[in-house]
Every structure is written in C-alpha cells, then in structure tokens.
C-alpha cells in the first residue's frame, strides 16, 4: 500500500496567504495540513508515500525532510501545475503505483485519523470517505449511491436532493482498480488532452465501465476541506479545540 498526497496547486482563493507558501503548509495550530495528513496516516500504519508537488515545491520537500526524517517518500513534480488540475497530478504517479493498493488524499483536508481507519477496515477494496452531516450545494463533489452503497454518480453536478453526501478527498483503491484507473487516465491525458479535470471524472468513467466504489460514511468524525479564508479559520478553530492535536512529538 502506498499513500498518494496531491499537493501541486496554487490555491488562488487563499491569496495573499498563499503568495509565498503552498496551501498545505499554512499553519494549523502547531501543525500544518500536510503535517496532520502524514501524522494521521502514520498512526494508521501507512509506511510508503508519494507526494506530488508543484507550486513552491521546495518548501514541501524541506518540510518533510525536517519533520519526518527517514520517511519512505517519493516526490514527483507537476511542472504544469499552473495549467492542470488534480487529474494530471494523479496520472504522474502511475509508475510508482503499478501493482499497489492506493490511498489517495488531497493535501488540503483537516480530518480525524479515524477516517483512514474506517476505509482500511470497511471490507471494501475500493471505497471513499463521505461526509453526510452538512448541507450540500453546487460547490461540493457529491456522490449518489445505490441501495448497496455503491457509488453510481460522483461529481459537482449531482443533484443535492439525491446525493448520499460529499466526497471529502480520501479514497482507497485495490491494485486491480488502480490498473483500470491509470489505463483510463492514459487515454484522458495523452489522447484526449483532458488535463484540467477533477480526478472524480475518471472515477465516474471507471464506474461506468463496471467497477464499483463504495461510499463509507464518516459519521461524526470531523473533516474539513480548506479552500477559503473562512475554511482556514474553521480548521484552526477545530484543531485548537481538539486535545489530541495539542501535543505531537514531531512539533516543538
């Protein structure tokens, strides 16, 4: 199993905070979003990592080297970060993920480590974390499921009234699914030049081709995607009020 963390974007909605710092390294209490993600994965026994960087990538590499010496991590650079979306960053990992189970995470999520445990112990080879405890609108990536919990539709365009919940950007896929996914990404990126989509567009095509991804409800476990200054303030308030994040041996 390898964890893939996508951290290439410029985070324009958080400017000027991200003028000189990548979003995943903005301070969140005594940590950062990337630091929290790595800590949560390590707590769940994940040992191998792939981080896709782009914007201000040297800061991310320096951060990981300083805070996580000895971590088994490979870095890949999305040199086209200013003109592509996360589907392209994911495609860059194809050689390192061949034959591997993949845990895929966006780098701008503040979340409870129990969410990773839910996926690992869900009983599903292919699944993603879904938040149901919020009002949905057009901004979120939403999922619609069948009666067995398999996802039938995933996109921002899913009707909120029929949606099971919001996909929060944490997924787990089997080696077989990973092979199918990267085969499709090769077509989308190389042949169709669809480099500026969300990776959920590829998930949808794999689902339409007969594969299943199951929705795992995170229940009351907290999670928050940070896109705006308001989100960042909410994330900082959450971390500041949660005792288990108050002390970490990796932080001063």
Model-assigned labels for residue ranges:
Residues 20-35:
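Short catalytic helix/loop segments, enriched in acidic residues and glycine
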Residues 24, 72-74, 150, 212-214:
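Conserved beta-strand segments of alpha/beta enzyme cores
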Residues 68-141, 145:
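Conserved beta-loop-beta/alpha segment of the NTase-like Rossmann-fold superfamily
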């Amino acid at each position: 199993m390898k964890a893939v963390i996508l951290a290439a974007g410029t985070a324009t909605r958080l400017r000027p905070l991200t003028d000189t710092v990548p979003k995943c390294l903005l301070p969140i209490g005594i940590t950062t979003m990337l630091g929290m993600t790595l800590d949560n994965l390590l707590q769940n026994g994940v040992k191998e990592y792939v981080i896709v960087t782009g914007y201000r990538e040297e800061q991310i590499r320096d951060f990981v080297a300083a805070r996580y010496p000895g971590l088994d991590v490979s870095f890949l650079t999305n040199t086209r970060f200013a003109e592509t979306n996360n589907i392209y960053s994911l495609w860059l990992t194809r050689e390192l993920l061949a034959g591997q189970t993949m845990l895929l995470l966006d780098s701008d999520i503040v979340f409870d480590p129990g969410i990773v445990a839910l996926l690992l112990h869900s009983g599903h080879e292919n699944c993603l974390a879904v938040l149901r405890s919020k009002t949905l609108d057009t901004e979120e990536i939403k999922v619609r499921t069948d009666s067995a919990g398999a996802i039938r539709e995933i996109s921002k365009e899913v009707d909120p009234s029929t949606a099971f919940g919001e996909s929060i950007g944490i997924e787990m896929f089997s080696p077989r699914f990973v092979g199918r996914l990267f085969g499709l990404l090769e077509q989308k990126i190389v042949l169709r030049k669809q480099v500026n989509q969300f990776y959920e567009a590829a998930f949808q095509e794999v689902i339409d081709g007969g594969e299943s991804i199951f929705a795992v409800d995170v229940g009351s476990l907290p999670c928050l995607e940070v896109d705006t200054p308001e989100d960042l303030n909410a994330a900082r308030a959450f971390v500041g009020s949660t005792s288990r994040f108050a002390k970490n041996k990796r932080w001063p």
